[in-house]
Regions:
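Short, glycine-biased loop/turn motifs at secondary-structure junctions and
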Residues: 2-216
Length: 216
């Protein structure tokens, strides 16, 4: 399934089912699929010191408590940007969180004692899974990177717009995410991911969730 395009909720459901199968394969007990940002060499702070994460294995630590100890990740991909806000200076992964798990009461952060890196995320994939998170949890607090109705991204950056009639624009190379809500509630009816390529999607032009130009 491509990461860019106009998505029906049936497609989102299929993607959710695929993620669920990963839980069955990788999990040992109460496991969650989440997202984590790292330095380019896959190192990150863990328990007050720098930890070097490894691919293709379970990384393990003794204790997990949010904001204090353990490996930290987030259910909402966009929460990772609070800690590593510059895409070009970090790498972002889908991860499996397992072992002892502690969840934060403030945002979607998770602390765990076992963590496995599953998939490195492109910008397009990252915005897509962020939109899927909104579909699955429409009433949860919005990440600060999600803008109501209108969002704007600089060249090669990202923007996410959510609302009754969301629209977004960006410079060349920007990735735009859109989530349309129900007329009388906060549930999500449609999502879209668009890359400003200078051909199908033009720089500094607002687009709606159907990929159509919007005059604002």
């Amino acid at each position: 399934m491509p990461w860019t395009g106009i998505f029906s909720l049936s497609a989102v459901t299929k993607k959710k089912m695929k993620t669920g199968s990963q839980k069955a394969v990788w999990g040992r007990g109460y496991m969650k699929i989440a997202y984590k940002a790292f330095r380019p060499d896959l190192s990150c702070q863990a328990g007050g010191s720098t930890y070097q994460y490894q691919l293709q294995k379970w990384n393990e630590i003794k204790e997990a408590k949010c904001r204090e100890t353990g490996f930290h990740c987030a259910e909402d991909p966009l929460d990772c940007l609070s800690y590593y806000p510059v895409w070009e200076q970090a790498v972002y992964y889908m991860v499996a969180a397992d072992g002892d798990i502690d969840e934060d009461a403030c945002d979607s952060k998770i602390a765990c004692t076992r963590l496995r890196l599953l998939k490195k995320m492109t910008k397009e994939a990252y915005i897509y899974v962020a939109l899927v998170y909104m579909v699955q949890h429409p009433t949860r607090n919005w990440n600060a990177n999600v803008k109501r109705e209108r969002a704007v991204a600089d060249r090669n950056q990202m923007a996410v717009s959510r609302g009754k009639n969301p629209a977004a624009k960006g410079g060349l190379g920007a990735v735009l995410g859109l989530a349309k809500e129900t007329p009388d509630g906060c549930g999500i009816t449609d999502i879209a991911v668009c890359v400003v390529d200078g051909k199908r999607y033009l720089p500094d032009v607002f687009y709606d969730v159907n990929g159509n130009e919007v005059l604002i």
